[in-house]
Amino acid sequence: EPGTVPFDRVLLNDGGYYDPETGVFTAPLAGRYLLSAVLTGHRHEKVEAVLSRSNLGVARIDSGGYEPEGLENKPVAESQPSPGALGVFSLILPLQVGDTVCIDLVMGQLAHSEEPLTIFSGALLYEDTELEQV
């Protein structure tokens, strides 16, 4: 169902800055963070999501692939997601103290299993005190 994705199976949460109930990470330090996610949808179902930093979209994941404007006349079969399609991203973001990061599901349903099919991870690469002054 659309909304913020709560990654409730936490493998590591040093400092407790990720809230598994809300799905929101709050940056404890200003710096550069590496953020990654793999989103797995139900078979034959497109998954679309947005990585948000302090409620502003930063990156978009679309398991159906990129569709530029003007493709409305293509056959439906060409625009369907393939079985087992994934949405994946990995990026480095500058975060200030108190910035929040979350993944908001826009469309589709994520697969649930005992296996870790859908994951989110983040790590501070290095602290940057100049970001605190911005």
Predicted regions and their residues:
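Extracellular jelly-roll beta-sandwich "head" domains, especially the C-terminal globular C1q domain
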Residues: 1-134
